Amino acid sequence: MTKNTSINIGQLMQSSGVSFGTSGVRGLVSAMTDELCFAYTLAFVQTLNIAPKSRVAIAMDLRPSSPNIAAACHAALSFAGIETVFCAALPTPALAYYAEQNQMPGIMITGSHIPFDRNGIKFYSAEGEITKTHEQAMSTAQVVMPQVKFSVALPEVNLAAKEFYLTRYRNYFAPNCLAGLNLAIYEHSSVARDLIKELLVGLGANVISLGRTDEFVPIDTEAVAKVDVERAKTWANTHQFDAILSTDGDADRPLLGDEKGQWMRGDIVGLLTAQFLGIDAIATPVSCNTAIEASGYFKEVKRTRIGSPYVIEAMQSWIKNSPMKVAGFEANGGFLLGSALRSAQGDLAALCTRDAVLPMLAVIALAKQKNCQLSELTQSLPARLTASDRIQNFPTENSRAILQKLAAQSESIATLLGDLCGEFANIDQTDGLRITFKSGDIVHFRPSGNAPELRCYAEAADQLRADTLVAESLTRIKSFAFN
């Protein structure tokens, strides 16, 4: 490369396929070259006007490709005269919290739950996750690439971010609040596996470590693999635990199971967390369970497009203009706290980034407070059960074309799902195509923002019906696509 080569990020996106999804930049590892990651980091520095001699925190998940990407981002920061605070392997919310508390931007290297052959980069300003406006500015940025190495050795690890994160929970939850509980951790390749164990032991729990692996396993908390469904039930019989805790790869999405090894739906975990914390106002995507409104727990509920930036945007209007306690959560279980809270033990700082640890602690604490098992917590909620799954390797443009056709032609909906669900009442195109039927059944199709997948969410009066709706709807729409 010659000196001072200019690169347009928009053109780089098109040529590489590495682009912004629902949260952060995602793409194939083979396309995320040192040069590309260097360029994206310069665009981030340029968009946020990060001055030389500033500090930027970098952390990463446990994907094999993450250290190389982190090194390229560090090289770009060094070229721009910016100091890297390298936090090494750390949960995304821990990186975000540390950056926010220290008023510095942050970069998280993670592909979250997406397939093994992909990875990503999430960017944070000193105020939290960057907005869609920031993303648009980065997407049109023109950066000047120098004649330097696009990857340099990472600096020494700074452990402060981990301690900041642990202290957030220790300040709010009383010591020994989990005493007497047997809690299992499905460790797999979660970046939070050791941190969660340390936290639970410190709060008095007896901890059982299960399923640790050195190979990276992409866990999708909205489409839990059948092997993990069966594994949790087997472990429950063997180990007699009160709950089983896990997360996706970068620990911003919880995976919480009850004493029977039944994984709880993420939006139900979010609802129960908000109940425990005494939240007044909830922002949540259109795909989440309608039990949120039907429960009557909250003064206000706002529905958004899918993706944490949209949830954060909805939360911000309350945070700026209302004294209400504000939070948000998604169908994946990631919980965002918009208001600082206080308990008898101490304060819980706000964190407007998806978090997996808070919701798991809150739901377990709620069950202990009510002197019941986790499986009993949902029995007081309105009978609205949900399910979700996906068709992988399904091009996004195909998904969009099919959904546009269904939305434009009501007879197509009747042909596709009429004998399964009956007559439809209305459609919602806030994000994808959400079809509500007069029977009360809901089927929601949406292209994933992070990978070439078509997702399906369903809601019904019982779990078997919701599971059937998802399985049958995906089978039918796949056939519909090829006819």
Q: Which residues make up each language-model segment?
A:
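Short acidic active-site motifs
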Residues: A94-L95, R231, R465
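A generic structural motif
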Residues: E127, K260, E459-L464
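Residue-level detector of beta-strand face positions
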Residues: K122, L255, R434-T436
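Phosphate-binding chemistry for phosphorylated carbohydrates and sugar-nucleotides
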Residues: I9, K162-Q373
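Gly/Ser-rich phosphate-binding catalytic loop and adjacent alpha/beta segment
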Residues: T2-P218
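Generic secondary-structure signature for well-ordered alpha-helical cores
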Residues: S30, D34, L42, Q46-I50, ...
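Phosphate-binding and adjacent anionic-ligand microenvironments
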Residues: I279-Y457, Q463-N483
